[in-house]
UniProtKB/Swiss-Prot annotation:
This is Protein-export protein SecB. It is found in: Cytoplasm. It comes from Rickettsia canadensis (strain McKiel). Keywords: Chaperone, Cytoplasm, Protein transport, Translocation, Transport. Its main location: cytoplasm. The gene is secB. Signal peptide: none annotated. InterPro entries: SecB (IPR003708), SecB-like_sf (IPR035958). GO terms for cellular component: cytoplasm. CDD domains: Translocase_SecB (cd00557). SUPFAM superfamilies: SecB-like (SSF54611). GO terms for molecular function: unfolded protein binding. GO terms for biological process: protein folding; protein tetramerization; protein transport.
Length: 152
């Protein structure tokens, strides 16, 4: 029988979320109220997403910012345009620095994305439209695509 020593002072590697917040939020409803009468057809949604990572002054503290922009259009109108900058402050505790890029580009954005998604859904609904429910995002695939583009 083996014994596991649980009396160590060693802190296990983990990611701590210190804060989450809206940095910037803008919703434009440029064709209202005419656009609200044209909701019988499904609009075309153009969506863009970008991730910014900032190393904060303290060791192993990072700000990860999601920049999401969505524009909804139909044949006649731009229905709405929403822009959201949503960020989190993360502390990478006892994690090898070689793992930081993938954690900051994949795991941290995945942790805060559901909150950004909810904000966008609520705002678009409050503007008189069906809530914009952004599909889940594969941050791992985005990271690997970006890395392969940098290598070429």
């Amino acid at each position: 029988m083996s014994t596991i020593n649980t009396n160590t002072n060693e802190v296990m590697p983990h990611i701590s979320v210190n804060a989450q917040y809206i940095k910037d939020l803008s919703l434009e409803n440029p064709s209202a109220p005419s656009s609200l009468a044209a909701l019988d057809q499904r609009p075309q949604i153009d969506l863009s997403l970008d991730i910014n990572i900032t190393n904060l002054s303290e060791e192993n503290f990072y700000e990860v910012e999601l920049n999401i922009e969505a524009i909804a259009r139909n044949e006649k109108y731009t229905l709405f345009q929403i822009e959201l900058k949503y960020a989190g402050v993360f502390n990478l505790i006892n994690i090898d620095s070689e793992q930081h890029p993938i954690l900051l580009s994949v795991h941290c954005p995945a942790m805060i994305f559901p909150f950004a998604r909810k904000i966008i859904a609520s705002c678009t609904q409050d503007a008189g439209f069906q809530p914009l429910m952004i599909d889940p995002i594969d941050f791992g695939a985005l990271y690997h695509k970006k890395m392969s583009e940098h290598q070429n």
